Regions:
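Short, basic-rich loop-to-helix N-cap that marks the start of a DNA-contacting helix
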Residues: 41-54, 70-72
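Residue-level detection of the helix-turn-helix DNA-binding "recognition helix"
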Residues: 28, 39-41, 68
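Active-site phosphate/pyrophosphate- and oxyanion-stabilizing loops and adjacent acidic/basic residues
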Residues: 12, 21, 50
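Short polybasic/polar patches that bind polyanions
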Residues: 12, 25, 54
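Key DNA-contacting residues within the recognition helix of helix-turn-helix
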Residues: 35-36, 45, 64
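DNA major-groove recognition helix of helix-turn-helix/homeodomain DNA-binding modules
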Residues: 28, 47-62
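A short, Lys/Arg-rich alpha-helix, primarily the initiator
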Residues: 1-17, 61, 65
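Short alpha-helical DNA-recognition segment
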Residues: 17-36
Length: 72
């Protein structure tokens, strides 16, 4: 699993120009929790991973379990 910083960068990129409040409300989490996920301070628990993936229309694996091309 990528580290929290990589996951955070992915979440920030997916959010784009959407306000954090919009994403947080849609996923049933606080803005502060989303901020911690996006800044790499915390990794969301599995239930929240699913909610975020659904919101962004992505597979959970695509966001949270990407492998670097040099990993084997």
């Amino acid at each position: 699993m990528p580290d929290a910083a990589v996951i955070g960068a992915t979440l920030r990129k997916l959010r784009g120009d959407l306000p954090r409040l919009t994403v947080a409300n849609a996923c049933g989490i606080s803005v502060s929790a989303l901020t911690m996920y996006e800044t790499g301070q915390r990794v969301p628990r599995d239930e929240i991973k699913v909610k975020l993936a659904r919101f962004y229309g992505k597979a959970v694996d695509a966001i949270f379990f990407k492998q670097d091309s040099h990993e084997m």
